[in-house]
């Protein structure tokens, strides 16, 4: 079995409801388009090898450096930068341990991609979103992390989309000069301005019996404890 770990970025944002595997894809970033290209390349091989695709959203957990940059300003300054001016964008998340469980389930019992779907805008089978059921507003995620850190009164700092894109553009230039990618970029700013990144894990729960082993709050606490114990802050 060939398991491709793709991303919700390959599918795109969703407003007003959870994105499902049957929705037409609409990637809005270079990262998302590259992930979608990988999906189609894998699907083109599905007549020769069994292929299953997983699409996690924001992955977090101990040891993760990219997610750490969300936690750090909350710990150090009590500030949570929020894309946009109205704080109404939601986010789906999955802890790395739960994602690992889903990978094993998909390898053992998952359906496989139909090679005919390589020319379609969605996969009818063999593709799963995997996430926690909670879909908090990104602004509220700051309060949840603050609670895990024992901090209250977290300041949600609205970052206008234009400012985020400017900062992302500068960060991209710096990364190119340094010769290695950074955590923040113009592409990430583009994703942050696009809307809500929320998806449904109903399919993987129904077909494979997937379930997260702890609540989102407990997983955030576990992650904070990992960072604290190892002095990352």
Whereabouts are the PLM-identified features?
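Conserved Rossmann-fold NAD(P)-dependent oxidoreductase catalytic core, especially the SDR/UDP-sugar
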Residues: 1-30, 44, 52
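Active-site helix of classical SDR
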Residues: 34
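Conserved beta-loop-beta element that borders a ligand/cofactor-binding pocket
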Residues: 39-62
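A conserved pocket-lining segment of Rossmann-fold NAD(P)-dependent short-chain dehydrogenase/reductase
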Residues: 72-98, 102-106, 110, 114-124, ...
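Conserved C-terminal active-site "lid" loop/helix of NAD(P)H-dependent oxidoreductases
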Residues: 96, 120, 127, 169-211
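Non-catalytic, hydrophobic alpha-helical segments
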Residues: 99, 103, 130, 141, ...
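Mid/C-terminal beta-alpha module of Rossmann-like enzyme folds, strongest
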Residues: 109-183, 221-222
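Amphipathic terminal alpha-helices
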Residues: 199-207, 211-233
């Amino acid at each position: 079995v060939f398991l491709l770990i793709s991303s919700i970025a390959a599918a795109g944002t969703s407003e007003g409801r959870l994105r499902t595997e049957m929705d037409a894809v609409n990637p809005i970033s270079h990262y998302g388009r590259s992930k979608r290209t990988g999906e189609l390349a894998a699907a083109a091989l599905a007549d020769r090898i069994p292929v299953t695709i997983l699409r996690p959203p924001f992955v977090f957990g101990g040891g993760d450096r990219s997610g750490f940059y969300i936690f750090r300003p909350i710990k150090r300054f009590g500030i949570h930068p929020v894309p946009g001016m109205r704080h109404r964008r939601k986010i789906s998340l999955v802890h790395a341990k739960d994602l690992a469980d889903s990978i094993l389930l998909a390898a053992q019992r998952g359906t496989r991609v139909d090679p005919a779907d390589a020319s379609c805008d969605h996969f009818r089978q063999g593709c799963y979103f995997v996430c926690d059921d909670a879909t908090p507003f990104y602004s509220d995620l700051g309060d949840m992390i603050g609670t895990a850190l024992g901090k209250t009164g977290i300041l949600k700092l609205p970052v206008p989309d234009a400012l985020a894109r400017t900062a992302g553009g500068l960060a991209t230039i710096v990364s190119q000069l340094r010769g290695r990618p950074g955590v923040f970029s113009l592409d990430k700013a583009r994703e942050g301005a696009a809307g809500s990144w929320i998806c449904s894990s109903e399919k993987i729960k129904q077909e494979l019996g997937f379930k997260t082993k702890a609540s989102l709050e407990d997983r955030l606490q576990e992650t904070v404890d990992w960072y604290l114990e190892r002095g990352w802050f």
